[in-house]
Amino acid sequence: MVGLDPHSAPAVLKAENKLTKDSGTTVDEFVKWQVVSSNGRTYHFSSASGKIWERSAAGTWTLVHTTVAGAGEHKCLGAIEFRGYIVWATESRLHRILATDAEGSSEWTANKVLNWQTFTKTNKYWHPMVEQNLNLYIGDGNQLAEWDGTTFTASALDIKVPLVIKCLGKIGTDVIIGTYIDDSITKTEVFRWNTWSVSFTTSDTIEEVGVNAFIPADNLVYVSAGLSGNIYAYDGQNLDLYKKVQGEYSSTATAIVHPDAVSNFGGQVLFGVSNVSGNPCLQGVYRMGRNSRNYPWIMDLAYPISERNTGAFVISSIEVGSIVTLGQKILVSWKNSTTYGVDLLDTAKLDGAYFETRVMRPDRMAFSMFTDFSIAYNSLPTSTAVTLSYDKNYTGSYTTPTTPQVVDVDRKVISLEEGIEATALQLKAVFTCVTTTTPSIEMLQVSLT
């Protein structure tokens, strides 16, 4: 499924709300860290330079500051709000500004405190941050720095070299640490630390090229690890392979989840899948969710980014940098080649959302005649539609039927009569939406003769 909502109304399927570009032309670099501030604004940090953009509560975007660090590179490698301060990291330095003094570019110019603290290891790739037990923890190479609101400690915990801290999360009252060594090393570890012992509490080793991100859920943590779409469930001690983002992975076809491209939205888990090489899978904002405990968990590509290519979704050769929840909406930063942006979840529905069936093979050794196709719906607003196409015998592309679909408004059924002789058949159903209205369907039935 791409862009569909199987959760809000049980037993029916309809289009999701769409992502719409909110940043205009203001954001001109890839954002990998975002902060939702207590001052009612959001801040967006460039991964390519020291640029920091502000989004006001009214949705106005402004470049408020460009960081120039006292040493090392200027691009942002981590950011958070902690105890009323907006804190961000560059390679060698930590910087801050009071959120109440950070409204607009003039306040940033007057009140920012650059080079507030200095890192020991000066890692040039990641300085992830997490708040736990009233303290702020920041990754720096193989060390974990700590700020308790008064004292900054550059090395509150160290782990063994050559492991590098790539992402941070929390479980219970503990901090969890995700690590990475090198793209050629298929082994890494997750550490759990109680924040006060001289060493970590537990660790678990997995055969993956790094831990990419911790994905927060209700009373548990999911973990993105490696370059092949693997999602693990973490119980505080052990990692257990839970799901896999569907795709065809190899040494030249890999994907990743960036450390801040995760969020929890209305009880549903979101994570952004980015291409590394070869486009092994569809890319965008995936969701793991369910309506209630009585329903199974479903993983789907819920939110394609706002970019389009002649009307089609852009779900390859992109990156999702960061996802944050903003009330009842989300902000999603992305990169598409040399185009960048931050999307906001819209009230309009996603025109073109679709699902593909499993391949149907009634008798794989003989041809079958597929004759009648019926879609039962409970709502089909004016000018909306659900349109079928088919792929027979693994051609890899979908064909438009030669006969028209017929809508029976009394039975609320969309019918298609088209004789398709095939050993294997797959269907695609595309939703046509109009502003905030979407079809809502209950089932798809296929008949054979």
Predicted regions and their residues:
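N-terminal beta-propeller domains
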Residues: 1-70, 75-114, 125-126, 133-156, ...
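Conserved loop/turn at the beginning of each blade in beta-propeller domains
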Residues: 26-29, 71-73, 120-123, 129, ...
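Non-cytosolic beta-sandwich-type ligand-binding/adhesion modules
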Residues: 55-57, 90-91, 97-102, 295-300, ...
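Beta-propeller fold detector
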Residues: 62-68, 105-117, 153-159, 199-206, ...
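A short, polar beta-strand/turn micro-motif
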Residues: 152, 157, 198, 237-239, ...
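Exposed aromatic-hydrophobic patches
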Residues: 156, 202, 316-320, 409-419
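Conserved blade-ending motifs and adjacent loop-strand segments that build the rim/top face
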Residues: 246-260, 292-325
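Blade-level signature of beta-propeller repeat domains, shared across WD40, Kelch, NHL, RCC1
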Residues: 312-358
